[in-house]
A protein has these predicted regions:
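Membrane-proximal, proline-rich intrinsically disordered regions
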Residues: 20-68, 245, 404, 422
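Conserved, well-structured interaction surfaces
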Residues: 41, 45-59, 63, 80-153, ...
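Short coil/turn linking the two alpha-helices of tandem helical-hairpin repeats
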Residues: 150-151, 155-157, 229-238
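Polar, glycine-rich mid-to-C-terminal structural blocks
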Residues: 229-231, 259-405
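A solvent-exposed, charged loop/short amphipathic helix patch at secondary-structure junctions
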Residues: 238-257, 451
C-alpha cells in the first residue's frame, strides 16, 4: 500500500510539473516584435513621445529630481530635516550617494534614442519630411541627455550610434575627453539643425497640440549652451585639472591649456540664436495692458513665466511637480514658496514657506534710478550683514521711510519700508515681497511680516523643522497679483511653462 501511495504521489508530481511547464511555455511567434512597432505610425509616435520622458523635472523644487534651489547659493530652504539637498550644501556626499543619481536614467534615454534611430526607417506611413523631423528629434534628445550627463558628471563615455549599455558604471568606465564630448554633441546638433522645422506648423504638425517638441531654435540654443561651457574657465585650461585625470589611452580628460578662440565660437553660436529670433520667431515678452511704466516692467518680467508659450520661450515644457503633484505642476512650486499666512482666509491659502531668496540674491538687484548695482561685496566672507555699498548707486543700507507707496499696489496705504527696499529695479518687486510690505492681493488685505505672527506669518524658530520664513523676504514671481488661492483648484488650474531655453 505504501508503494502505491508513493507511485501515486510521483505521478501527481510529474503531472503538476508538466502542467507548470506548459503554462510558462510562451509561444513568441504571436508576440509583437520591435520591427512591428516601427511599421505602425501611431506606435512610432508613442515611442517618440517616450523619448521625451527622460527629461528631468528641473522645475521641481523638492524630491529626487528637484532641490536645485537648495543646492544653489541663490536661495534658502527653511526645510532642513528629512531633505536631500543638505547633502550637497554640507559636502556630505560620495560616489556611493544614490540621491540625485541621474546617470542610469540618462543612459537609458540615450539607449532608447539610438534604438529609435535604428528602426525608424521601417515606418512607411509617415511622410519623408516627418520622418526626417523625428530622426532629428531623437538625435537632439540624445545629445541633450549627453549634455545633462556632462553638466553633472563632467566628460562621459560616448556611445555614438551604437546601442548604449544601460548598465554602464560611472565609477569604472573609461571616459572620453571634454573636447570629444563637446565635439560629439555639437556635431549632432549641426547635423540635424536643418531637418528641424523653425515651427512645427511648417511641416503640418499642430504646434498647440504638440507644444514642447524640439525645433531648430532649441538645437541652436543647446549648441550655444554647450559651447559656452566649453569656453568657460572650468573646461578651458583650468589649473585644477592640469596634469590630472587621464583615460586608458593616455589622454587628459580636461584641456591642459586655455583656448581663447572657444569664446569666439560660443559668441557665434549665441548670435545664431539671436539672428533666428530677429526673423520674428522669438522676442522679449512685453506687457501691453499696464499703463504705468514701472508696473508694466514688473508685469513684463512676471509674464515671462505666467504667460505660457510666449515668444520669449525657445524650448520648454509644461511645469511638473512630483512630490506636490496634487497641487499641480505650477501650484506645487508656488505653494512651497508661499508664506504660511496665518491672517489669510481659507485653509488652503496656507503656504509652506519652504523656499526663500538668499540675501545675496536680494542684494543683486540694481537700483531703478541709477541702474547701478548697490552691493559690490561684503566685509566678511560669509557675513552678509556688512555689505560694501556703491556710494553712487543711491542705495541706503539703514533707516526707514514712512508712508512709502509700494510699487504695483494701488489699493493699500503707505507703509513703513526699510530704505534698502526703496527705488529698486522693477524685477525686485516682481520677484520679492520684503518684510512689512503688502502681500499683493487686495482681497486678503494683509502684510507680510517675517518676525512676528500678528499679521501674516509665523515667527521663525531655528528649533522647528521648517515651513517658516527664515529671512525678511518671500518669493512672489509665480504669484499673479490679486489671484485667489482659497481652494485647491486655484493651485491646480495654474499652468506655466518651464523654459529650458529662452531669449533673454
Amino acid at each position: 500500500m505504501k508503494k502505491i501511495r508513493i507511485f501515486a504521489t510521483a505521478l501527481l508530481l510529474a503531472f503538476t510539473l508538466s502542467s507548470c511547464e506548459s503554462f510558462f511555455d510562451v509561444e513568441l511567434d504571436d508576440q509583437a516584435k520591435i520591427e512591428d512597432i516601427f511599421r505602425q505610425k501611431t506606435e512610432v509616435q508613442k515611442y517618440l513621445s517616450h523619448l521625451y520622458s527622460y527629461i528631468p523635472q528641473e522645475e521641481e523644487v523638492v524630491g529626487m529630481h528637484g532641490w536645485t534651489v537648495g543646492r544653489s547659493d541663490e536661495a534658502l530652504f527653511s526645510w532642513y530635516q528629512w531633505v536631500y539637498y543638505t547633502q550637497f550644501r554640507t559636502g556630505n556626499y560620495s560616489s556611493a550617494t544614490t540621491n540625485f543619481n541621474y546617470w542610469p536614467d540618462y543612459y537609458i534615454g540615450i539607449n532608447q534614442c539610438s534604438i529609435f534611430l535604428k528602426y525608424i526607417d521601417l515606418d512607411k506611413e509617415d511622410t519623408p519630411a516627418t520622418l526626417a523631423y523625428m530622426k532629428a528629434e531623437a538625435r537632439f534628445l540624445r545629445a541633450y541627455y549627453y549634455f545633462l550627463l556632462f553638466r553633472q558628471y563632467g566628460p562621459v563615455f560616448i556611445w555614438g550610434d551604437q546601442i548604449a549599455d544601460e548598465t554602464i558604471d560611472g565609477k569604472t568606465v573609461d571616459r572620453h575627453t571634454v573636447q570629444q564630448n563637446i565635439d560629439f554633441m555639437v556635431g549632432e546638433l549641426d547635423a540635424i539643425k536643418n531637418d528641424l522645422p523653425v515651427r512645427t506648423d511648417d511641416i503640418g504638425i499642430d504646434g498647440k497640440q504638440w507644444a514642447g517638441r524640439v525645433t531648430r531654435g532649441a538645437a541652436l540654443a543647446l549648441k550655444s549652451r554647450i559651447l559656452l561651457y566649453a569656453a568657460s574657465p572650468l573646461y578651458n585650461g583650468c589649473d585644477l585639472y592640469k596634469g590630472q585625470m587621464q583615460n586608458i589611452r593616455g589622454e587628459f580628460l580636461f584641456p591642459q591649456s586655455k583656448d581663447e578662440t572657444k569664446w569666439e565660437a560660443a559668441a557665434q553660436a549665441a548670435w545664431d540664436v539671436i539672428e533666428l529670433a530677429e526673423t520674428g520667431l522669438y522676442d522679449l515678452y512685453k506687457d501691453t495692458e499696464q499703463t504705468d511704466e514701472f508696473t508694466r516692467y514688473m508685469s513684463s518680467y512676471q509674464g515671462v513665466r505666467l504667460k505660457p508659450w510666449n515668444k520669449e520661450t525657445i524650448w520648454g515644457w509644461w511645469s511638473r511637480s512630483g512630490v506636490y503633484s496634487w497641487l499641480g505642476g505650477t501650484g506645487g512650486l508656488l505653494a512651497c514658496a508661499m508664506p504660511g499666512m496665518t491672517g489669510a482666509s481659507g485653509a488652503v491659502y496656507q503656504g509652506y514657506g519652504g523656499i526663500q531668496p538668499s540675501l545675496k540674491l536680494v542684494d543683486s538687484y540694481p537700483m531703478y534710478t541709477t541702474g547701478r548695482y548697490p552691493v559690490t561685496g561684503y566685509q566678511g566672507e560669509n557675513d552678509m550683514s556688512k555689505p560694501i555699498v556703491d556710494p553712487q548707486s543711491g542705495y541706503q543700507a539703514t533707516g526707514f521711510t514712512d508712508g512709502y507707496k509700494q510699487p504695483g499696489i494701488d489699493w493699500g496705504d503707505g507703509i513703513k519700508a526699510h530704505n534698502s527696499c526703496i527705488n529698486r529695479d522693477p524685477r525686485y518687486y516682481a520677484c520679492l515681497v520684503p518684510n512689512g510690505f503688502w502681500w499683493p492681493n487686495k482681497t486678503e488685505n494683509i502684510k507680510f511680516t517675517c518676525y512676528n505672527n500678528d499679521a501674516c506669518t509665523n515667527k521663525w524658530n531655528a528649533g522647528e523643522g521648517g515651513g517658516i520664513t527664515r529671512v525678511g523676504y518671500v518669493w512672489r514671481r509665480l504669484y499673479e497679483t490679486n489671484k485667489s488661492l482659497r481652494e485647491a483648484t486655484d493651485y491646480t488650474t495654474m499652468k506655466t511653462v518651464y523654459p529650458a531655453f529662452r531669449l533673454a
